[in-house]
Amino acid sequence: IPQCRDVKESGQPNDKCRCNGKPCTVGKCTIARGDDNDKCT
C-alpha cells in the first residue's frame, strides 16, 4: 500500500491523493488512487 504522500493525482490539491474525499498528506491510502471511498490510515 503506497504512502499517501507518495501518490500524486493531478487535479487534487497539492497533487496529493484523496482519502475519504479529502486530500491526504500523511498515512496510507487503502486504494492507491485515493478514491472518494478510500481511507487514510
UniProtKB/Swiss-Prot annotation:
Question: Which Gene Ontology cellular component annotation is one that this UniProt entry carries?
Answer: extracellular region
What is the name of the protein in this document?
Ornatin-A2
Specify whether Plastid is a keyword of the entry: no
Originating species: Placobdella ornata (Turtle leech)
Compartments, as annotated in UniProt: Secreted
Q: What biological function has been recorded for the protein in this entry? A: Potent inhibitor of fibrinogen interaction with platelet receptors expressed on glycoprotein IIb-IIIa complex. May prevent blood from clotting during either feeding and/or storage of ingested blood.
Q: Where is this motif: Cell attachment site?
A: 33-35
Q: Which residues form the signal peptide?
A: none
Q: What is its main location?
A: secreted
